[in-house]
């Protein structure tokens, strides 16, 4: 989860987020090198007074400043396209969860189980237990088995919302009348928080998401307990 005064990205908890972090670092390196080059050229232009009236045009220079930006764009675009297709790749999910956005809470349905559904509301600050996370903890968390492909089906009952968990690299719009999907695999156990990332009304800031990744045996015990209740 995010830390106070954090400037970087959250620690990755899924393969997709690891890819996104690597792509971020790759792109930042390219942009930094371009910025250094441009800054150097600006300094040279400002501090020198060299003039050459005979250098009116240069075919070689025009080729270079056309080809080089194209190469730079390709080095950025290819990894981006690869990750784009990876985020849309869904095959043989072990678990499917349907998330429905409401003003201003989420409801979840485990479609592989009979009548296993619940609403998830933010816990008010005055009701938080010691150790609870203000504005992020909820009364009913999503629980998923770690190291298993999970498919999320996401929609909305009223206005546009966005189901987002940064540590998993997942952000999907919840649109009324439309069923969007996403997939993720949690690579480690833990508690991961997110929030609605689409302004959806007065209490937009108060519809968090809490997902708990646990070993498969713990997940089976949890489902048995939920179904029994």
From Swiss-Prot:
GO cellular component: mitochondrial inner membrane; respiratory chain complex IV
One Pfam entry name: COX2
Cleavable signal peptide: none
Top EC category: translocase
Cofactor: Cu cation
Residues in the Mitochondrial matrix compartment per record: 46-59
UniProt: Cu cation A1 binding residues: 161, 196, 200, 207
Cofactor binding comment, as recorded: Binds a dinuclear copper A center per subunit.
UniProt: Cu cation A2 binding residues: 196, 198, 200, 204
E.C. numbers: 7.1.1.9
SUPFAM superfamilies: Cupredoxins (SSF49503), Cytochrome c oxidase subunit II-like, transmembrane region (SSF81464)
Keywords: Copper, Electron transport, Magnesium, Membrane, Metal-binding, Mitochondrion, Mitochondrion inner membrane, Respiratory chain, Translocase, Transmembrane, Transmembrane helix, Transport
Gene Ontology process terms (BP): ATP synthesis coupled electron transport
GO terms for MF: copper ion binding; cytochrome-c oxidase activity
Record field: catalytic activity: 4 Fe(II)-[cytochrome c] + O2 + 8 H(+)(in) = 4 Fe(III)-[cytochrome c] + 2 H2O + 4 H(+)(out)
Subcellular location: Mitochondrion inner membrane
Intervals, Mitochondrial intermembrane compartment: 1-14, 88-229
Membrane spanning residue stretches: 15-45, 60-87
Annotated membrane topology: Multi-pass membrane protein
InterPro entries noted in UniProt: CcO_II, CcO_II-like_C, CcO_II_C, Copper_CuA, Cupredoxin, Cyt_c_oxidase_su2, Cyt_c_oxidase_su2_TM_dom, Cyt_c_oxidase_su2_TM_sf
Residue sites binding Mg(2+) per the record: 198
UniProt-listed PANTHER family: CYTOCHROME C OXIDASE SUBUNIT 2, CYTOCHROME C OXIDASE, SUBUNIT II
Stated role: Component of the cytochrome c oxidase, the last enzyme in the mitochondrial electron transport chain which drives oxidative phosphorylation. The respiratory chain contains 3 multisubunit complexes succinate dehydrogenase (complex II, CII), ubiquinol-cytochrome c oxidoreductase (cytochrome b-c1 complex, complex III, CIII) and cytochrome c oxidase (complex IV, CIV), that cooperate to transfer electrons derived from NADH and succinate to molecular oxygen, creating an electrochemical gradient over the inner membrane that drives transmembrane transport and the ATP synthase.
Subunit structure: Component of the cytochrome c oxidase (complex IV, CIV), a multisubunit enzyme composed of 14 subunits. The complex is composed of a catalytic core of 3 subunits MT-CO1, MT-CO2 and MT-CO3, encoded in the mitochondrial DNA, and 11 supernumerary subunits COX4I, COX5A, COX5B, COX6A, COX6B, COX6C, COX7A, COX7B, COX7C, COX8 and NDUFA4, which are encoded in the nuclear genome.
Record's protein name: Cytochrome c oxidase subunit 2
Source organism per UniProt: Petromyzon marinus
């Amino acid at each position: 989860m995010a830390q106070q005064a954090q400037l970087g990205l959250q620690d990755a908890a899924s393969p997709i987020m690891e890819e996104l972090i690597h792509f971020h670092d790759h792109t930042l390196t390219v942009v930094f090198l371009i910025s250094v080059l441009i800054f150097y050229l600006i300094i040279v232009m400002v501090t020198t007074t060299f003039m050459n009236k005979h250098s009116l045009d240069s075919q070689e220079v025009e080729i270079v400043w056309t080809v080089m930006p194209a190469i730079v764009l390709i080095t950025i675009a290819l990894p981006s396209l690869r990750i784009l297709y990876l985020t849309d790749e869904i095959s043989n999910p072990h678990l499917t969860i349907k998330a429905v956005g409401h003003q201003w809470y989420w409801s979840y349905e485990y479609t592989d189980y009979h009548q296993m559904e619940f609403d998830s509301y933010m816990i008010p600050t005055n009701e938080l237990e010691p150790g609870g996370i203000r504005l992020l903890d909820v009364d009913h968390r999503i629980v998923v088995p770690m190291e298993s492909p999970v498919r999320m089906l996401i929609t909305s009952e009223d206005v546009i919302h966005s189901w987002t968990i940064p540590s998993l690299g997942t952000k999907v719009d919840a649109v009324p009348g439309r069923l969007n999907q996403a997939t993720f695999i949690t690579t480690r156990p833990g508690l991961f928080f997110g929030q609605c990332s689409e302004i959806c009304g007065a209490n937009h800031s108060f519809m968090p998401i809490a997902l708990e990744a646990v070993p498969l045996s713990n997940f089976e015990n949890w489902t048995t307990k939920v179904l029994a209740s």
